[in-house]
């Protein structure tokens, strides 16, 4: 995340990257964000109450759970300003060799813009509509795809079979 965030800062949630042993209350003092989404450089916590917390003092216990369940923290802790997204609007796209792909052939302009600024041969882009209707980047994946989400296997293989 620290690599792509500066390139897409205007299209994603505000984010601070901190050490895993930080005093989160002190580091986040004065921000007054409506909540926080917590992840390390690679992944969020997908069990229990998840990675959403309301107060900075809830972050350290969440980081401890991440460490317990995953065995390590990858890089630092990404503290993201919680944004409200419209339910059911998150969708995954892929970029392969600079070309953007969609599971349904409709590719938002934001995906194409990401494909132009991210220098990687293969990555995923998760987008969702924020409550105000703005399309936002939720996450970029570095090719270590854990799930195709709404992509059928045939469509995914079709994308990978294309060579430029």
Model region roles, listed by residue range:
Residues 1-113, 162-164:
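Active-site nucleotide/adenylate-binding loops and adjacent lid/helix of ATP-dependent enzymes
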Residues 99, 106-164:
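ATP-dependent carboxylate activation and anion-phosphoryl transfer catalytic cores
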């Amino acid at each position: 995340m620290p690599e792509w965030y500066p390139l897409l800062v205007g299209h994603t949630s505000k984010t601070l990257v901190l050490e895993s042993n930080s005093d989160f209350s002190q580091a986040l003092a004065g921000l007054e964000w409506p909540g926080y989404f917590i992840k390390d450089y690679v992944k969020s916590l997908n069990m229990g109450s998840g990675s959403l917390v309301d107060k900075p003092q809830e972050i350290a216990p969440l980081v401890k759970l991440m460490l317990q369940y995953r065995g390590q923290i990858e890089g630092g802790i990404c503290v993201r300003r919680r944004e409200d997204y419209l339910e059911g609007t998150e969708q995954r796209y892929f970029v392969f060799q600079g070309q953007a792909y969609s599971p349904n052939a409709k590719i938002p302009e934001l995906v194409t813009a990401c494909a132009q600024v991210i220098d990687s041969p293969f990555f995923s882009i998760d987008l969702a509509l924020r409550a105000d209707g703005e399309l936002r980047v939720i996450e970029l994946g570095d090719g270590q795809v854990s799930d195709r989400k709404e992509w059928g296997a045939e469509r995914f293989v079709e994308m990978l079979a294309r060579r430029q």
